């Protein structure tokens, strides 16, 4: 059955493949997986129907109650890694977000612990603006076509919902100070002088950090509309 008993009793997945890039611009493809330390526990159809008739917010409530009681839920983070030359060794496209990388070893990266509930739901939850375009140096979007669309559409949606300066809000703001030529716009809380709001520019000293190199993928061929050849549907 597919209805989680609570959010603390379910796993999480990146769905899409991403790239991890080193200082030389070399990259590998990765998928991330959050494994619930509490284990997975789902409701039957009858249980889900009865419970959700009384409390449609049961999964959120169960998670918050666990935290309130001091039983802090945990998830282990795992990563699967494929080298670029391995992509064509499968009978499906590993960049297809509907596919699981069965047989590819998982490596544990760490553990996430939720040790408190939001002190202010609006400030810490409703204002949160998640988007797959919010990537730190060293992680890039793969060529997954669905992900490429989401990189634009999610950021655009959050810009419409929260505003062009959503990344200035404490819940979205990076830990390290952002130095860029972005300025102004509705609800701007930053302090800027000057009028240069683009990059590159010879009028200001702000430049891209050369130590963070993007990966390069050589391409050759023709654009076309064609059926997907390696589908492996329903497996």
Listing of model-derived features with the role each one plays in the protein:
Residues 1-235:
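Active-site-adjacent core segments of small-molecule enzymes
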């Amino acid at each position: 059955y597919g209805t989680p008993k609570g959010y603390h009793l379910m796993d999480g997945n990146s769905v899409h493949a991403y790239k991890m890039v080193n200082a030389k611009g070399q990259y590998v493809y990765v998928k991330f997986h959050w494994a619930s330390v509490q284990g997975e526990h789902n409701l039957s159809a009858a249980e889900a129907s009865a419970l959700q008739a009384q409390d449609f917010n049961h999964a959120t409530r169960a998670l918050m109650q666990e935290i309130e009681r001091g039983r802090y839920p945990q998830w282990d983070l795992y990563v699967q890694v494929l080298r670029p030359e391995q992509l064509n060794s499968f009978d499906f496209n590993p960049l297809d977000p509907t596919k699981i990388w069965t047989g590819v070893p998982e490596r544990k990266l760490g553990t996430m612990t939720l040790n408190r509930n939001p002190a202010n739901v609006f400030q810490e939850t409703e204002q949160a603006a998640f988007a797959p375009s919010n990537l730190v140096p060293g992680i890039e979007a793969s060529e997954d076509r669905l992900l490429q669309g989401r990189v634009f559409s999610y950021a655009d949606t959050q810009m419409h919902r929260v505003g062009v300066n959503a990344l200035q809000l404490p819940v979205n703001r990076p830990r390290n100070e952002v130095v860029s030529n972005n300025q102004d716009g509705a609800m701007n809380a930053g302090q800027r002088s000057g009028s240069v709001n683009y990059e590159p520019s010879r009028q200001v000293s702000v430049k891209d950090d050369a130590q963070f190199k993007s990966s390069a993928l050589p391409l050759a061929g023709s654009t076309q509309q064609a059926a997907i050849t390696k589908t492996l549907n329903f497996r």
